[in-house]
Amino acid sequence: MAYPFQLGLQDATSPIMEELLHFHDHTLMIVFLISSLVLYIISLMLTTKLTHTSTMDAQEVETVWTILPAIILILIALPSLRILYMMDEINNPSLTVKTMGHQWYWSYEYTDYEDLNFDSYMIPTQELKPGELRLLEVDNRVVLPMEMTIRMLISSEDVLHSWAVPSLGLKTDAIPGRLNQTTLMAMRPGLYYGQCSEICGSNHSFMPIVLEMVPLSYFETWSALMV
């Protein structure tokens, strides 16, 4: 999860987030090289007295500044399209969970179980225990098995919301009357925090998300107790 004064992204917990981190570094390096070239050209223009006032035609230069940006865009687009395809691909999920956004809490339903559903509210600051995080803890965590493909069905009962967990690389809009879906797979156990990422009213900041990723045996025990 994030920590104070953090400059980079959160540590990747899912394969998708790892790909997004690699793509971020790839794109950032391209931006750095372009910026360095532009600054170098500007410094030359400011420090040299050479001018080309008689230049009327420069087809070679025009060819370079047409082809080079096209190549750069291709180098950015290809890995981006690959990741977009991976994010939309859903192959035989092991578990399906439906989440509904409300003003201002989340409700969850495990559709593979007959009667496993609950609401998840933020714990008020005055009720927090030592070590718990302000504005991020909930009364009911979403317990999920790790190292398994899980499909999330996301919608809303009232206004626009957005279900987001940064360390898993997830952000999906919750739209009234529309059912969106996304997949997640956590590679290690732990607690993963997120929040509503669409301004949805006065208590928008009080809609945290907490995923508790556990081994399959623990999940089976928990689900049996909940049902």
Curated annotation (Swiss-Prot):
Residue ranges of the TM segments: 15-45, 60-87
Modified residues (Phosphotyrosine): Y218
Its EC number(s): 7.1.1.9
Mitochondrial intermembrane side: 1-14, 88-227
Annotated compartments: Mitochondrion inner membrane
Keyword entries, A-Z: Copper, Electron transport, Magnesium, Membrane, Metal-binding, Mitochondrion, Mitochondrion inner membrane, Phosphoprotein, Respiratory chain, Translocase, Transmembrane, Transmembrane helix, Transport
A GO cellular component annotation in the UniProt record: mitochondrial inner membrane
Binding site for Cu cation A1: H161, C196, C200, M207
Stretches of the chain found on the membrane's Mitochondrial matrix side: 46-59
GO terms under biological process: ATP synthesis coupled electron transport
Record Gene3D superfamilies: 1.10.287.90, Cupredoxins - blue copper proteins (2.60.40.420)
Keyword set includes Mitochondrion: yes
PANTHER family: CYTOCHROME C OXIDASE SUBUNIT 2, CYTOCHROME C OXIDASE, SUBUNIT II
Family the UniProt entry places it in: Belongs to the cytochrome c oxidase subunit 2 family.
Protein name in the entry: Cytochrome c oxidase subunit 2
